[in-house]
Amino acid sequence: MSTTFQNGLYRTTLALPESPKSVPEARLVLVQMTNEHPHPVVVLPNGVTDNRWTFGNQGFLARDADWLKSLVSLPRQGFYTLTRELEIGAGAKLPEGLLVQLGYTADARPVIFPGQLMPGNSIQFASRGALIGDLQLDFLKVNEFRVLAPPATSTVAAEPASNVN
């Protein structure tokens, strides 16, 4: 297996030959190389928290090179800025420069959650987002920033806002 394989989120376009019922086509998966196996490991999402999928600890080995080539790479879940105005259906438009959170459906369709300034000087992202097409992913610019942990658990160390997974 090539060591140039990129760890990250993918959309399956074919069922995984080794486990077609567990990993069907059109599914969001996390694919990672590990030190334990010469082949990438395919991990399924196991839940959503704050518009972000979490992934389990166990996965399926992907031994089929053609299957790996069929995967569609997806941008990481996290926070982005719109680089242009974006129409999200029914005439609704989101302005250029808007802070959004990117997530996915279980079948790996991209969803954006617009940020909204709330009382108390906080930004909130809705629990329901707007589906966007793959081509519209090009209108997102990643935001890299850090925030302090909540006061109850705060030490003073900053934690990444995390564009992880």
What are the roles of these predicted feature ranges?
Residues 7-14, 76-85:
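Extracellular/lumenal glycan-associated surfaces
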Residues 12, 30, 66-70, 82, ...:
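A structural signal for short, hydrophobic beta-strand segments that form beta-sheets
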Residues 42-75, 113-165:
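Intrinsically disordered, low-complexity, charged/polar segments
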Residues 1-16, 31, 154-165:
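Low-complexity, Gly/Pro
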Residues 72, 85, 89:
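Short, surface-exposed polybasic-aromatic patches that bind anionic ligands, especially phosphate groups
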Residues 9-55, 89-131:
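Basic/aromatic-rich interaction segments and small domains that mediate binding to polyanionic partners
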Residues 21-22, 58-61, 79-81:
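A short linear-motif detector with a strong N-terminal bias
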